[in-house]
């Protein structure tokens, strides 16, 4: 069994530093995928992957790389769906896991919100601000996901 790999949808990810710390503790590889050259620590477990700036290029790369040994970190519901179908574990940056059971309702809610925004303009609102509790929940969830993947329970 190969070691777990954390695939990060990195362009707007607020928990990159937390990912690095947890990955180092577990000896897990991290692939930081973005459309631009983000700064990443110089560490043998961390790889920066810069994709083209084409629409969904980072999502496409992550979805192709995702498998049962992967943990994908993304707030993108459609990417989460693709990664789950590839067998990966998926976490939102706030620590909420996406699962095969929860992804359908999440996609439906996303579609409803898109329709509301289209009909009412941008005044519908978005997610709440990222909090310290979100960060703590993410750290716990990533640690637990890595343990599950290492044990083959994901």
Swiss-Prot record:
It comes from Sphingopyxis alaskensis (strain DSM 13593 / LMG 18877 / RB2256). Pfam families: DUF188. InterPro entries: UPF0178. This is UPF0178 protein Sala_2376. Belongs to the UPF0178 family. PANTHER family: UPF0178 PROTEIN YAII (PTHR35146:SF1). The lineage of its organism: Bacteria, Pseudomonadati, Pseudomonadota, Alphaproteobacteria, Sphingomonadales.
